[in-house]
Design a protein with these regions (language model features):
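Hydrophobic structural segments
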Residues: 1-119
Length: 119
């Protein structure tokens, strides 16, 4: 890392990033729920998010209750990859808001630790 002192090399986790794939039609409602739970704050800014369009594909198997399509039918659907940040202490609230607002039976999402230098 090229650190000159031990203090300069220490990092801590104070925020995390949520990445989730959301159907185009649900982007606004999922964002609103996440922001209401405390996600999207960066410094003096609120409601911060980044999203990019893509295409999701899935095949609902027996026992599934798909929101879109039917069991045994492969589907392709326009989705957004949505990213936002949140303080670590709000993780339970943010994940709960995601699961309650996302239309999919089993939403795909990742949680990443964001390292920040201790100063």
């Amino acid at each position: 890392m090229g650190c000159t002192s031990e203090r300069a090399c220490k990092v801590r986790v104070v925020r995390r990033k949520l990445v989730v794939f959301v159907p185009v039609s649900a982007l606004e409602s999922v964002c609103e729920a996440l922001f209401a739970a405390g996600a999207g704050h960066i410094g003096g800014y609120e409601r911060c998010a980044w999203y990019t369009p893509g295409m999701g594909t899935f095949l609902a198997g027996e026992g599934a209750a798909p929101t879109i399509g039917e069991v045994g039918q492969e589907r392709r659907i326009g989705e957004y990859r949505l990213e936002t940040v949140y303080p670590t202490e709000l993780e339970a609230d943010v994940v709960r808001a995601l699961l309650e607002s996302h239309p999919y039976e089993e939403p795909v999402f990742d949680l990443y630790e964001l390292l920040e230098p201790e100063v």
